[in-house]
Amino acid sequence: DLQLPLTIAVTSEAELYTAVNRIGFPLYVKGIFYEAYRVQTIVEAAAQFRNIAAVWGLPVIVQAAVQGDELNVVGVGDGAGGCLGMVGVKKTSLSSLGKMWGGVTIRHPAMVAAAERLLEVCQWRGPFELECIVNGDDVFLIEINPRFPAWVYFAAAVGVNLPARLIQHIRGEDVDTNSDYEVGQQFLRYSWEMITTMERFQHVLTQGETN
């Protein structure tokens, strides 16, 4: 089953200090919608609390740091306790905000079993992303997102087209629910510069398409 690291929601610096004393360092200070920062001191924790609260509001989440590998699972629940498919990924590269910038497909039996148990208990309907720390057979749920992640095309590229399966399920069509994919497939996100005119750029902003 999924385990949860000690997690406390705080709404003031006084509550932050109490949570920090209970959890101990290192720990994470996280926004309710976005951003997570690993901190080592109370000064760092207080600074990140103020920064996150100013952007994302309260409460701010304080969470114990857990040792292990950062693994993610993306999938789709059928709403009846089953799964329309899932893909496990190990993070190999992170952005400055801790988001996955690169990853490699893995298959971790304990993590798959924990994800399947979650879908069964919650009767989960629709897409999901589980962000986990895995140490041996211990699987700690760090975050759950009720949506497809930005890297969902990676799952389709390795043979498990989750968005297509979701649409088929919604339409009442037969869905291939296998989760067969090759372990060791890798993706790396990158960016590039586009050169254009101001007129064309403004047209995209105002019309939503190029002319």
Residue ranges, per PLM feature:
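Active-site nucleotide/adenylate-binding loops and adjacent lid/helix of ATP-dependent enzymes
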Residues: 1-68, 78-82, 109-112
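Short, conserved loop/turn and helix-capping segments at secondary-structure boundaries
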Residues: 42, 105, 109, 156-161
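Short acidic-glycine loop/turn motifs at beta-strand connectors
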Residues: 77-83, 134-137
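Glycine-rich phosphate/pyrophosphate-binding beta-alpha loops
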Residues: 92-103, 145-159
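A long amphipathic alpha-helix within ATP-dependent nucleotide-binding catalytic cores
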Residues: 55-56, 98-141, 145-147
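Short beta-strand scaffold segments in enzyme catalytic cores
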Residues: 72-75
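Peripheral (often C-terminal) accessory segments that flank ATP-dependent C-N-forming ligase machineries
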Residues: 16, 135, 164-211
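A glycine-rich, hydrophobic loop/mini-helix early in the fold
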Residues: 85-89
